[in-house]
Regions:
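P-loop NTP-binding core
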Residues: 1-256
């Protein structure tokens, strides 16, 4: 995206990069990433989604059901970055019917994570991939894998901020501290500007006493130092249906 001043000078406007992160699986990272991105696109923003999970959960939920058959994925682009090969504008980008773009992922990314361990500048390979795209989008959302490995560190190193979807369950609350320690370490050693957007409580069930207790525990334990969004994502059987349909909640159930 470009901003033109009165004198004719052009200033490149860089995208805001948000890593959707939690080392626990099944907390709604991919669903959050997809629907947040499409929601922003509906408001006129240009959005790129990046699947950084070798399982390809985001890629599959957006309608590409066989990610292992895709010729160009995030793994392809990161391999180019590691070997100092140029990445062409728009290379590997897929276009979704609901107005967002996607850099997909597949199982090849698992092998690349192992290769990153021995790579120079290993924490910043994803940042190199995204450097060109930052001028083309308003937002870049990174769907992170359920671990705190090198790919997640790459996402945090490239991001301006991180959004943490989190189930209202005891084990999720226990695992949050480990994630926050990783964020602090990345902030100290690699990306001092990294911020925490907040915790988004997902799969909530306000009908149960247990769900309410965990909700209160998270808000009381972390609410003073981290934003815990008032808006929560309730548990719904529709979530699986929406992912299978390859659509967002906006297209699947436009009447809400």
């Amino acid at each position: 995206m470009r901003v033109v001043l009165r004198g004719g000078d052009v200033i490149a406007k860089k995208a805001t990069i948000i890593a959707v992160t939690n080392q626990k699986g099944g907390v709604g990272k991919s669903t959050t990433c997809e629907n947040l991105g499409i929601g922003l696109a509906m408001e006129g923003k240009k959005v790129l989604l990046v699947d950084t999970d070798p399982q390809g959960s985001l890629t599959i939920s957006m309608g590409w059901k066989q990610p292992d058959e895709l010729n160009t994925t995030l793994s392809t682009l990161m391999q180019k970055a590691m070997s100092d090969q140029p990445i062409q504008p728009g290379e590997g980008v897929l276009h979704h019917a609901e107005g967002v773009d996607l850099i997909p992922a597949n199982i090849e990314l698992a092998g690349l994570e192992e290769a990153l361990v021995n790579s120079m500048n290993r924490e910043k390979m994803l940042k190199q991939v995204l450097d060109g795209a930052k001028r083309e989008y308003d937002y870049i959302l990174l769907d992170c894998m359920p671990s705190l490995g090198m790919l997640t560190v790459n996402a945090l190193a490239a991001a301006d901020s991180t959004l943490i979807p989190m189930q209202t369950q005891y084990l999720s609350a226990k695992g949050l501290e480990q994630l926050l320690q990783t964020v602090q370490k990345v902030r100290r050693q690699i990306n001092p500007k990294l911020k925490i957007e907040g915790i988004l409580l997902t799969m909530t069930d306000s009908r149960t006493t247990y769900g309410k207790q965990i909700d209160n525990l998270i808000r009381q334990g972390y609410g003073r130092k981290i934003n815990v969004f008032e808006q929560t994502i309730p548990r719904s059987v529709r979530a699986a249906e929406i992912s299978a349909a390859g659509k967002s909640i906006f297209a699947y159930d436009p009447k809400g």
